[in-house]
From Swiss-Prot:
Provenance organism: Aedes aegypti
Subcellular location: Secreted
Cystine pairs: none
Entry-annotated residues carrying Leucine amide: L59, L126, L147, L157
Origin superkingdom: Eukaryota
Pfam families: PBAN (PF05874)
Signal sequence annotation: 1-22
Protein name: PBAN-type neuropeptides
Disordered: annotated span: 120-151
Length: 171
């Protein structure tokens, strides 16, 4: 294992020395500028490209074209999030066709109402309460018990009637 690392390091050092002696290799930006100059296009366009390459990519929120956005939203609204393929019953019947024996796992039907299907465009508005929760009493009790204490509030700070009075403290 040591020999492998040794030969790898020797090869890396050899390549580093060879590239240093061989001359400076232009980076990709310089090559692009040289190719652009050789093509003979406007120098004004070259300065715009060079500035864009110098400052890097544009940061911030990129907007989608309105037509593309509308098409995407229509496609999302047409397909509910829960299931968008063939019905499971149809797929099962196609699989079971032509087989002599089929094992079916049946589940009981749930007697509750089916849940409404939510689409992508219906999102809850955070920070808003619906009308059903506005009728609830959200006020605190007069004294909130802390650390599991269920005793009523006593403003006397630990003193109570009938407790022994401590006058002498042992240090």
């Amino acid at each position: 294992m040591f020999r492998l690392y040794f030969f790898f390091n020797v090869i890396c050092i050899f390549l580093a020395i060879r590239s240093a002696i061989g001359g400076e290799v232009p980076d990709a930006t310089e090559q692009k500028i040289n190719n652009f100059l050789a093509s003979g296009k406007d120098s004004e366009d070259l300065s715009k490209r060079a500035a864009a390459m110098w400052f890097g990519p544009r940061l911030g929120k990129r907007t989608i074209a309105s037509e593309l956005h509308d098409e995407m939203m229509d496609e999302i609204d047409d397909n509910p999030l829960y299931y968008s393929g063939e019905s499971p019953q149809r797929v099962a019947s196609e699989i079971a066709q032509g087989t002599p024996y089929v094992v079916l796992l049946l589940t009981g039907r749930v007697l509750r109402q089916p849940q409404p299907v939510f689409y992508h465009s219906t999102t809850p508005r955070l920070g808003r309460r619906d009308a059903s929760s506005s009728n609830e009493n959200n006020s605190r009790p007069p004294f909130a018990p802390r650390l599991g204490r269920n005793l009523p509030f006593s403003p006397r700070l630990g003193r109570s009637f009938g407790a022994p009075v401590v006058d002498n403290f042992a240090y």
